[in-house]
A protein has these predicted regions:
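N-terminal signal-anchor/start-transfer transmembrane helix
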Residues: 5-23, 215, 222, 283
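Alpha-helical transmembrane segments and their helix-start/interface "positive-inside/aromatic belt" motifs
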Residues: 24-35, 160-169, 297, 301, ...
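Hydrophobic alpha-helical membrane-insertion segments
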Residues: 32-45, 169-179, 384-396, 473-494, ...
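Membrane-helix interface motif
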Residues: 46-56, 180-191, 317-323, 396-412, ...
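Hydrophobic alpha-helical transmembrane segments
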Residues: 69-83, 203-217, 420-436, 511-535
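Hydrophobic transmembrane alpha-helices and their helix-loop junctions in integral membrane proteins
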Residues: 88-101, 108, 112-133, 143-465
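Aromatic-capped, Gly/Pro-kinked transmembrane alpha-helices
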Residues: 490-529, 541-675
C-alpha cells in the first residue's frame, strides 16, 4: 500500500511542479518523476517475477466497488518493458526538446502528459477492476493525444492526433461493451468476475466475448485492418514519443490480449487460428508497405505493424498449442511472443531516436533527400545499423532470439498435427519467412539511402552528430539489443514466470524439447564473440600491414563518366523497383511521371506515392458511405432557433416516456406469456 501511495504522490507533485518550473527545469522534473515511479514499480515487478505476486485492495467507491491491484508475473514483465522505454524516452526527449524551449506552455503540457502516460501504462498492467482499468485507459489515450500534437500548429500533426483520438475511443467503446456485458451478469467489476462469467457460459458466448475484447486490443496494438492510426501518429509525434508509442503504448494491446486469454475460458484452437491469421496478414502487409515508404518515420511505423504481427504469430501458436495439447508448441510460441515484445520495444525505440537525430540534423524525414550522413553522423549511423540488423532478425542480436523461438515453435507444431493445422502452419511459416526477407530489403534501402553515398538534396545547414544527451539513451537500448543476442539465457529465465501462467493450463513444467531449444540459444553467444574477436584480429593485422604504405583516396570508379552528380545515385524508390513492380497488384501505388520526348531532354520526372489500400477499403469507403447517409438528414440543421428548441423538448419527452413505455411493453409480454 505504501508503494501505491508513493506512486500517486510522485505523480501529483510532478503535475503541480511542471507548469510553474523554469523552462530548463521542466524536463528535469519529468525525468525525476518517471525515474521515481519507475523505481517504485520495478520493486513490485521484480518481486512478482521472482514468484511473489503483489495484491492490494483499494477502497474505491460505491460505483467501482473495491479496486484490486494485482501484479502477477505477466503484469511485471510488461511493467519492466514500459519502465525501460519510458526512462530512455524521457532522457532522449530532454535533449530533443531543447530546440523548443521558447514554447514554455507547450513544454509544460508535454511534460505533464508524459508523466501521465507512464502512470496510466503502469496502472493498466496492475489494475484488476474494469472501471478503474477503463479510467486508466482513457487517461493513456488523452495523454498520448497531447504528446502526439506537440507541434499542433502543423495541420498534418493535428490531423494525425485527431485520427488517433477517434480510433482510441472506438477501442474504448469495445472495451466498455465487453466489461459491461460481464458486469451486468455478475454484478461485479473485478476481473475475477470475467473468469466466473466464462465458466458459467457456453463456448460460443465466451468466444464472442473474447472477440469483442480482441477487436479493442487489435485497434490499440495496430493489427491489420485496425492499424490505420499508426502510420499517421508515429511520424507526427516527436521522436521520443514515437519511440515510446511504438515501444510500449501499442504493446499495451498485446498485454490486453494475453490478459484476456488468461481470464476467459475458451476454445483455444479457434481463437488461436483467428489471432494467427490476423497476425500473419499484419506482419506481411506491414513490411510490404514499409518497404516502399519515402518518409523514414513512416517506414518505421509500418515496421511496428509488422512486428506486432510477429508477436501475434507467437501468441496464436501458443493458443493452438494449448488447444491441441502440444506443450512444446505452446511453450515456444508464448516464449517467442513475450521475448519479442521486449526486443521490439528496444530496437524500435532506438531506431526512432536515430530518426530524431537525423531530423534535427537535416530537418527532413524524406529519404529521397538524404544521403551520406555516415560521414557527418557516424555514431548515429552505427546505432541505426545495429538496430536495423536486430529488427531484421539477424544474429547475434536480440531479434534473432525471439524469432528463432517462434520458428522452432512452428516446426514443433507439425508433429502429429491434423491437415487443417498443417496448412495453417505452412501459411504462417511462409509469411514469417517473407517478413524476414522484406525487412532486410527495406532496411538495406533505408540505411543505404540515408547514410551512404552523397546527399541527394541541398542542405541549408551542415548536418552534425547528436550530442551525448541523445546518444546515451540510444547506447542503453543498444547494450540490451546486443546483450540479449549474446546472453539470451538470462532473459529467457526472466520470462519463465509469465510463461508458466499459460503453459500450466496443460501441465506443470517446461517440456524437454523446449529446454533443448533454449539451451541451443546459449551457443550463439560464444560463437558471436568468437567471430567478433576473429574479425578484430583480421582488422588489426590489416591495419598494421598497411600502416607504413602510402595511401591515396579517390572517388569510386564511375564507368569512365567524368561528370557524376548526386542525382545519379540509387534513390529509395529505384532501389526497390523490382519488388514494387511485383507487389503493385496488392498495393495502392500512385505514379506521377513526365515522359521524355526530346532527343536532348532538359528534365524528366518520375514519382511514386504509396497509399494504404486497407485504409481505403476499411476506413475511407465506409466513412464516405456514412457521410452520404448522414447528409440525408442535413435538413434538420436548418438554422432556426425555434426548431432547435422543439428538438430539445421532443428529446426530453422521449427520455421521460421511454421507461414508462418499456415497463408497459414488458408487462404486456408477460401477460401474453401467461395466456
Amino acid at each position: 500500500m505504501e508503494i501505491v501511495i508513493a506512486f500517486i504522490a510522485v505523480l501529483f507533485v510532478a503535475i503541480i511542479l511542471i507548469p510553474f518550473a523554469d523552462v530548463k527545469w521542466k524536463g528535469i522534473i519529468t525525468i525525476t518523476a518517471v525515474s521515481l515511479n519507475t523505481l517504485l514499480s520495478c520493486i513490485v515487478a521484480i518481486r512478482a517475477l521472482a514468484g511473489i505476486s503483489v495484491v492490494e485492495i483499494l477502497p474505491g467507491s460505491l460505483v467501482t466497488g473495491l479496486i484490486a491491484v494485482r501484479v502477477d508475473a505477466l503484469s511485471a514483465w510488461f511493467i519492466l518493458i514500459i519502465n525501460f522505454t519510458i526512462i530512455t524516452g524521457a532522457f532522449y526527449g530532454y535533449n530533443y526538446l531543447k530546440a523548443y524551449r521558447s514554447q514554455s506552455a507547450n513544454l509544460s503540457l508535454h511534460g505533464i502528459a508524459y508523466v501521465l502516460v507512464h502512470a496510466a501504462l503502469i496502472s493498466i498492467c496492475a489494475l484488476q477492476n474494469s472501471l478503474a482499468f477503463l479510467i486508466a485507459w482513457e487517461i493513456m489515450a488523452l495523454a498520448s493525444f497531447i504528446l502526439i500534437i506537440f507541434e499542433h500548429y502543423r495541420q498534418d500533426t493535428l490531423k494525425a492526433g485527431v485520427n488517433f483520438l477517434i480510433q482510441s475511443h472506438v477501442c474504448i467503446l469495445f472495451l466498455m461493451l465487453g466489461f459491461m456485458w460481464v458486469a451486468l451478469k455478475m454484478n461485479s467489476y473485478d476481473f475475477s468476475a470475467i473468469t466466473a462469467f466464462s465458466i458459467q457460459q457456453p463456448m460460443l458466448i465466451n468466444f464472442t466475448l473474447l472477440l469483442v475484447f480482441l477487436i479493442a486490443f487489435f485497434i490499440k496494438a495496430g493489427f491489420v485492418p485496425f492499424h490505420t492510426w499508426i502510420p499517421y501518429a508515429h511520424p507526427a509525434a516527436p521522436a521520443h514519443v514515437s519511440g515510446v508509442m511504438s515501444g510500449v503504448i501499442i504493446k499495451i494491446g498485446i498485454y490486453g490480449i494475453l490478459r484476456m486469454l488468461l481470464l476467459i475460458r475458451n476454445d483455444f484452437i479457434s481463437i488461436g487460428y483467428v489471432i494467427l491469421i490476423f497476425s500473419v496478414v499484419s506482419g506481411v502487409y506491414g513490411v510490404m508497405l514499409a518497404t516502399i515508404q519515402h518518409n523514414l518515420k513512416k517506414l518505421l511505423a509500418y515496421h511496428s505493424i509488422e512486428n506486432i504481427g510477429i508477436i501475434g504469430i507467437g501468441i496464436g501458436l501458443g493458443c493452438i498449442g494449448l488447444g491441441t495439447g502440444n506443450l512444446v508448441l505452446s511453450t515456444l510460441g508464448f516464449a517467442g511472443a513475450l521475448l519479442h515484445t521486449l526486443n521490439h520495444s528496444l530496437f524500435k525505440s532506438v531506431l526512432f531516436y536515430a530518426a530524431g537525430n537525423v531530423y534535427q540534423a537535416t530537418h527532413t524525414m524524406n529519404i529521397e533527400h538524404l544521403g551520406g550522413l555516415i560521414k557527418k553522423m557516424p555514431k548515429t549511423a552505427f546505432i541505426f545499423l545495429i538496430s536495423a540488423l536486430a529488427i531484421c532478425g539477424l544474429p547475434p542480436f536480440n531479434g534473432f532470439i525471439s524469432e528463432f523461438l517462434i520458428y522452432s515453435g512452428m516446426l514443433a507444431g507439425f508433429k502429429g498435427a491434423e491437415i487443417t493445422l498443417v496448412w495453417i502452419l505452412v501459411f504462417s511459416l511462409f509469411g514469417l519467412v517473407l517478413i524476414g526477407g522484406l525487412a532486410i530489403l527495406c532496411f538495406t534501402k533505408a540505411f543505404g539511402t540515408v547514410f551512404l553515398g552523397h546527399s541527394r538534396h541541398p542542405q541549408h545547414t551542415s548536418p552534425a552528430e547528436a550530442g551525448p544527451g541523445a546518444l546515451i539513451p540510444m547506447y542503453a537500448g543498444l547494450s540490451l539489443i546486443i546483450g540479449i543476442g549474446i546472453f539470451p539465457t538470462y532473459f529467457i529465465a526472466a520470462i519463465m514466470q509469465p510463461l508458466t501462467l499459460f503453459i500450466n493450463k496443460l501441465g506443470p513444467g517446461i517440456p524437454d524439447q523446449a529446454i533443448l531449444t533454449f539451451n541451443a540459444l546459449n551457443r550463439i553467444g560464444p560463437c558471436a564473440m568468437g567471430i567478433a574477436v576473429f574479425a578484430a584480429v583480421i582488422f588489426f593485422i590489416r591495419k598494421k600491414a598497411t600502416q607504413k604504405k602510402p595511401k591515396s583516396i579517390n572517388t569510386t570508379w564511375g564507368c569512365a563518366y567524368i561528370a557524376p552528380t548526386s542525382k545519379m545515385q540509387y534513390t529509395a524508390s529505384s532501389y526497390v523497383r523490382t519488388y514494387r513492380k511485383l507487389a503493385e497488384p496488392m498495393l495502392n501505388i500512385a505514379v506521377k511521371k513526365e515522359d521524355i520526348k526530346d532527343i536532348f531532354p532538359l528534365r524528366g520526372k518520375h514519382e511514386t506515392h504509396p497509399h494504404d489500400k486497407a485504409e481505403t477499403w476499411f476506413i475511407d469507403i465506409p466513412l464516405r458511405q456514412l457521410q452520404f447517409f448522414i447528409n440525408r438528414f442535413s435538413f434538420l440543421q436548418n438554422g432556426y432557433l425555434q426548431v432547435y428548441i422543439i428538438y430539445g423538448v421532443v428529446f426530453v419527452t422521449m427520455v421521460l416516456l421511454l421507461p414508462v413505455i418499456y415497463d408497459r411493453i414488458i408487462a404486456l409480454i408477460q401477460f401474453f406469456n401467461q395466456l
